[in-house]
Amino acid sequence: RTAEELRQGMKTYEGVVRRFDFKIKTDKLVLLSDYAHHPKEIYQSAKSLSELYKNRKITAIFQPHLYTRTRDFYKDFADSLSMLDEVILCDIYPAREQPIPGVTSKLIYDNLKPGVEKSMIHKEDVLDLVRSRDFDVLVILGAGDLDNYVPEIEKILKEKI
């Protein structure tokens, strides 16, 4: 490739889908979707959000991805998510896995640091939650199917602005 071809390509490059993907960005409300589904990725997202929005309440709705990953990293997930002001945990997205007895989102919930507002919700109730609440900065985290709700979440929140 020539330098000019690269320049032209960069002009039209829109970034990676679902990596810190802003859907709404106003003074009153920020909504973004992030594919982060590993504690290190969540840590980086939480760190960036905390730096960008120092004086704003940051809420994450997180859907853990895989029972084995949740079992192996629940403390790390809790540590990374504890950088945020509020964490709303959905049920684990199983993908290709069968449930593992005793492995649920509650493992993460129980290990969130004191001071973090926390709750658990079924994915099917997320839209009702978004309708009933006001948010400052809201990030939808995970690699599961919670992302399917993002267009409707965006629509609901835009009607509130």
Predicted regions and their residues:
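A short, gly/pro- and small-residue-rich
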Residues: 104-112, 152-161
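Short glycine-/acidic-enriched loop or helix-start segments at secondary-structure transitions
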Residues: 5, 70-71, 98-99, 149-152
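Short hydrophobic segments within beta-strands
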Residues: 61, 90, 140-141
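A structural signal for short coil/turn segments at secondary-structure junctions
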Residues: 17, 53, 133-134, 157
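A glycine-rich beta-strand to alpha-helix segment
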Residues: 125-156
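C-terminal helical cap/extension that packs against the catalytic core
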Residues: 78-136
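Nucleotide phosphate-binding/pyrophosphate-handling subdomain across enzymes
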Residues: 1-86
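Short glycine-rich anion-binding loops that position phosphate/pyrophosphate groups of nucleotides
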Residues: 37, 64-66, 93-95, 143-146
